[in-house]
């Protein structure tokens, strides 16, 4: 009886696997036009260097590529003009002087054809871009960043020395 149950279960799993191997593995899993919002979705997955624009059916409309030595810095926005503004960081960050949650390093503007129009890097011993940024109506970018303050400066500004971890303070700045 146990063999019959095992065989039946194995057959069901095999059939389910065959059905899944033919389904779309990227994009939309379920689509109800009555519940969907018109437009596209920008996807910038963590630890993958590319950003994808998909339609409501999950079909890829456009891809912006980055080299394999880069990883997302947690933010990407599409402008009304079709420019992609995204943040990224080196894939290997262990040697970076500042590393904390939400770490970025570069904010970059790219055209629809993936040409870099501009970039801004903050990733040194005094500061590192944080996880997000905002585009203003004037076309400028506001970004939050980690700021390293050494113990002498922190104490001079009123910080309790007992609360300084590793002899420094990480603050934030715009």
Can you say where each PLM-predicted feature lies in the sequence?
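Positively charged n-region of N-terminal signal peptides that target proteins for export
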Residues: 1-6
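Bacterial N-terminal signal peptides
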Residues: 7-17
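Histidine-/acidic-rich catalytic cores in large beta-rich domains
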Residues: 20-174
């Amino acid at each position: 009886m146990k063999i019959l149950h095992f065989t039946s279960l194995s057959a069901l799993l095999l059939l389910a696997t065959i059905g899944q191997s033919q389904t779309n593995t990227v994009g939309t899993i379920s689509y109800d036009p009555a519940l969907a919002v018109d437009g596209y979705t920008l996807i910038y997955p963590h630890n993958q260097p590319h950003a994808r624009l998909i339609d409501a059916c999950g079909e890829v409309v456009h891809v912006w590529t980055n080299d394999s030595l880069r990883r997302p810095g947690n933010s990407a926005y599409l402008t009304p003009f079709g420019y992609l503004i995204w943040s990224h960081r080196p894939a290997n960050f262990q040697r970076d002087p500042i590393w904390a949650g939400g770490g970025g390093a570069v904010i970059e503007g790219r055209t629809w054809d993936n040409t870099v129009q501009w970039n801004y890097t903050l990733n040194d011993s005094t500061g590192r871009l944080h996880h997000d940024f905002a585009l203003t109506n004037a076309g400028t970018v506001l970004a939050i960043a980690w700021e390293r303050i050494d113990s002498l400066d922190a104490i001079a500004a009123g910080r309790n020395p007992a609360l300084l971890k590793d002899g420094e303070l990480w603050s934030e700045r715009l």
